[in-house]
């Protein structure tokens, strides 16, 4: 048994300059596990609750001292002495201690930081890399990355309605080569935007945030950059979108302000289907609002056999909501964000629920990130085959990519790169 002897929480700063929670879990052996939690900008209404202090005199009300206090007192008392290797028991203890459906009493940020730090301590104690500790000794594949190189919506101050335009280097032979392709396209795009007098400042996730005449213009610039970097769109590099449609869904209509359009669910499904026919788009996240299940069903029936339709705000990493979506034939993929649900055990349950139903699972960062690389290990440990962790700039994004490079190197011939196999449920 590897007993927990102390837990120390602190308030640190995330990539947006906002406070977040970091936790150290100390074991009897002297081993320490450390983890820090992320925070989102566009959030689903059913996400687990991130506890903020609301004190306007500190960090504009975004302090997390109460969450830190909850860890250092109540949570510590509840799990000191427990075996750190009993992850599911620890997580259930935290859930029961909180006692609410959405972790609003103690805070999902407090609970998740402890859950992740316990896993890190247990891995260290076992002498295993985190991905091996979490995933066992079986065959593991490196995930195909979805790289957000043009930011819009809630992630940027610009005229683009949709939140993310991504490149997916699925046609490359290794993760290392996929990462290189992504970086080369990123630099080619910067050069193109600069030559046209467009801004090359970056958004929260490290992608460029230029003012463009339309949402479609973002796709066209990216295709130009792929070609300029010496790659072939559709063969080497595919495209992905995160519409974050809940952000512009009002009164039953989709308001694309940059184009002066107000579309019904059926019209917006047509709009997206036209793009899918025209461009090598393989993945669309939150193509409809979380409040528009009928629209989701319409979109799934329309293009769900040839495009990955990822539920983020829709499913909020919640196995119960995902099961409802599976039953109703809504979407064919789930985005996995550890802080939407609040423990590692519940995160893994959602991933398994997706896989059993033939849905894909995409491991994801948040727009407010830290240097914590746990999600990189989770993507390999669970054989999720896809990861979404930002652009090719900003260290909090690159930290995850660099961890995946290390994992690929460690596994050597005992691994392969998922590539286009990541989209196993498409025809």
Curated annotation (Swiss-Prot):
InterPro entries with a match to the protein in the record:
Enolase, Enolase-like_C_sf, Enolase-like_N, Enolase_C, Enolase_CS, Enolase_N
- List the active-site residues: 205, 337
Q: Which SUPFAM superfamilies match?
A: Enolase C-terminal domain-like, Enolase N-terminal domain-like
One Gene Ontology term of the biological-process aspect is: glycolytic process
Among the GO molecular function terms of this UniProt record, one is:
phosphopyruvate hydratase activity
What subcellular locations does the record give? Cytoplasm; Secreted; Cell surface
Tell me the residue numbers annotated for binding (2R)-2-phosphoglycerate: 163, 337, 366-367, 388
Q: Where does Mg(2+) bind?
A: 242, 285, 312
- Family annotation (Gene3D superfamilies): Enolase-like C-terminal domain, Enolase-like, N-terminal domain
Recorded GO cellular component terms are: cell surface; extracellular region; phosphopyruvate hydratase complex
List the cofactors. Answer: Mg(2+)
Cystine bridges: none
Enzyme Commission numbers on file: 4.2.1.11
Spans traversing the lipid bilayer: none
Q: Known catalysed reaction(s)? A: (2R)-2-phosphoglycerate = phosphoenolpyruvate + H2O
- Keywords linked to the UniProt accession: Cytoplasm, Glycolysis, Lyase, Magnesium, Metal-binding, Secreted
Q: How is the cofactor bound?
A: Binds a second Mg(2+) ion via substrate during catalysis.
Primary location group: cytoplasm
Pathway annotation from the record: Carbohydrate degradation; glycolysis; pyruvate from D-glyceraldehyde 3-phosphate: step 4/5
Family statement drawn from the similarity comment of this UniProt entry: Belongs to the enolase family.
Q: What does this protein do?
A: Catalyzes the reversible conversion of 2-phosphoglycerate (2-PG) into phosphoenolpyruvate (PEP). It is essential for the degradation of carbohydrates via glycolysis.
Matching PANTHER family, A to Z? Answer: ENOLASE
Name of the protein this chain belongs to = Enolase
